[in-house]
């Protein structure tokens, strides 16, 4: 069958993770655990980008940045505070989203799975290691774009390009070119942290 051909193309580690499941359970695990994993990364990326675009370009557009620059706060402290005000909510929302998705996935699939099956180790790495790195990537690119943008909308639209690598991960996972595993997720997180630095 088509499912058997798809499963044969998967890495051995991924095949082992679904061994012992019937076909309906395999579909649930593939859909909820593997195929949606890269899409989860869009959440911290976009939250950080929107908040950063408003914080940097939006302040410039509203002409409120000048007042901040006249305060006794150093430029460095102001930059760090603005970056943290984008990064912290993005990571918090990603972690809350992870918890809500964990509950929802287990409740929705209980009839098929009959047990708690989510999250697996790969998702824990994705939420705790990769999501903050992706938020940092969105933040960094938006800060760079905001320095040249005149308006919040312009900064947000130009910074939206940062979602393209994540969309490539989504397409790669859906087409079978790329399979998320714990090791790939750890490597992906390391790559994003290096880019952030």
Model-derived features: positions:
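Hydrophobic alpha-helical transmembrane segments
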Residues: 1-35
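Hydrophobic alpha-helical transmembrane segments that constitute the membrane-spanning cores
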Residues: 47, 80-109, 133, 137-138
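Transmembrane helix boundary and interhelical loop/hinge segments in multi-pass membrane proteins
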Residues: 48-67
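Alpha-helical transmembrane segments of multi-pass membrane transporters/translocases
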Residues: 181-197
């Amino acid at each position: 069958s088509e499912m058997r051909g798809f499963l044969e193309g998967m890495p051995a580690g991924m095949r082992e993770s679904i061994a012992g499941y019937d076909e309906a359970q395999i579909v649930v695990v593939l859909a909820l655990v593997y195929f949606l994993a890269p899409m989860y990364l869009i959440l911290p990326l976009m939250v950080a980008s929107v908040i950063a675009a408003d914080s940097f370009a939006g302040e410039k557009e509203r002409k409120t940045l000048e007042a901040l620059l006249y305060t006794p706060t150093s430029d460095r402290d102001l930059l760090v505070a603005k970056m943290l005000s984008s990064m912290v909510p993005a990571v918090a929302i990603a972690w809350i989203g992870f918890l809500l998705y964990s509950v929802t996935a287990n409740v929705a699939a209980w009839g098929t799975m009959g047990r708690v099956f989510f999250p697996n180790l790969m998702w824990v790495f994705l939420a705790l290691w990769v999501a903050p790195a992706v938020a940092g990537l969105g933040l960094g690119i938006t800060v760079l774009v905001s320095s040249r943008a005149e308006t919040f909308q312009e900064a947000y639209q130009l910074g939206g390009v940062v979602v393209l690598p994540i969309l490539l991960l989504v397409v790669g996972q859906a087409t079978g070119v790329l399979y998320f595993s714990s090791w790939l997720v750890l490597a992906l997180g390391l790559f994003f942290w290096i880019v952030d630095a």
